[in-house]
Amino acid sequence: MQIDNTVLEKLEKLSHLRIDDSKKEEVMGQLSEILGYIDNLNELNTDHLDAAFSTLKGGTPLREDIPRTENNIARDILSRAPESKDDFFIVPAIIE
């Protein structure tokens, strides 16, 4: 896939970013390199690999799934919020 101005404008809109006109050529080149790298990865034959393949000897260690709450952490985080109520952040509405 070739990155052109049309694709870059669509990416800007989707990401809510604005790329300065002086940087657009550079960004298009970088994105093209990234897509080229992904194309190389897509060409790799991974048929012989198990879907759960791990590079760690013995696999990934499991841990017990025990929920825990530390109320001081939540209180500490909420204390830094501009506005909160009943253990929730209050944010501006984004959908009308």
From Swiss-Prot:
Subunit structure: Heterotrimer of A, B and C subunits.
Keyword check for Kinase: no
GO BP of this protein: glutaminyl-tRNAGln biosynthesis via transamidation; regulation of translational fidelity; translation
Single GO MF descriptor: ATP binding
Catalysed reactions, semicolon-separated: L-glutamyl-tRNA(Gln) + L-glutamine + ATP + H2O = L-glutaminyl-tRNA(Gln) + L-glutamate + ADP + phosphate + H(+); L-aspartyl-tRNA(Asn) + L-glutamine + ATP + H2O = L-asparaginyl-tRNA(Asn) + L-glutamate + ADP + phosphate + 2 H(+)
Job description of the protein: Allows the formation of correctly charged Asn-tRNA(Asn) or Gln-tRNA(Gln) through the transamidation of misacylated Asp-tRNA(Asn) or Glu-tRNA(Gln) in organisms which lack either or both of asparaginyl-tRNA or glutaminyl-tRNA synthetases. The reaction takes place in the presence of glutamine and ATP through an activated phospho-Asp-tRNA(Asn) or phospho-Glu-tRNA(Gln).
PANTHER family, per the entry: GLUTAMYL-TRNA(GLN) AMIDOTRANSFERASE SUBUNIT C, MITOCHONDRIAL
SUPFAM superfamilies documented for this protein: Glu-tRNAGln amidotransferase C subunit
Gene3D superfamilies found in the cross-reference section: Glu-tRNAGln amidotransferase C subunit, N-terminal domain (1.10.20.60)
Alphabetically ordered keywords of this record: ATP-binding, Ligase, Nucleotide-binding, Protein biosynthesis
Family, as annotated: Belongs to the GatC family.
Protein name as annotated: Aspartyl/glutamyl-tRNA(Asn/Gln) amidotransferase subunit C
Pfam families: GatC
Domain of life, source organism: Bacteria
EC number in record: 6.3.5.-
